[in-house]
Amino acid sequence: RELTTPLGFVDDGAMEAETRKIMARLNPNFKKIKEPVSALSGGQRQSVAIARAVYFKAKILIMDEPTAALGVHETQMVADLIKELKNQGLGIFLISHDTREMMELCDRVAVMKNGQLIGIERVEDVTEDDILSMIIMGKNPKKAA
């Protein structure tokens, strides 16, 4: 994937073709390839940021509150994108305070409080109440049982 000319200049045609290919894979409805990122919605900007990581063949994406400050539609768009990347085998490390988002998008949940690891559980083994209990009480109810 050479995006520069032999003299080191960016090859706009190659860059656009590669961008279209990646965005089609990640977000088939994305049509604003030539728009500046600053003109995009929050969800579209998240898609572009994720596409950059995919372009550089990241094995793991670390996402800190990827849906914070997004509207309902954009939140779902980013969630769908995260699910698609998981299905493609990309590792996702998601940092979130949204327990519903965790339950929907994660395989495992780790809870930390004051720098201490409270517990790591598979989402199918815990409820949102269990997670909230770990956050509030600072103990893992699964380990006490």
Question: Residue spans of the language-model regions?
Answer:
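Glycine-rich phosphate-binding loops of nucleotide-dependent enzymes
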Residues: R1-A145
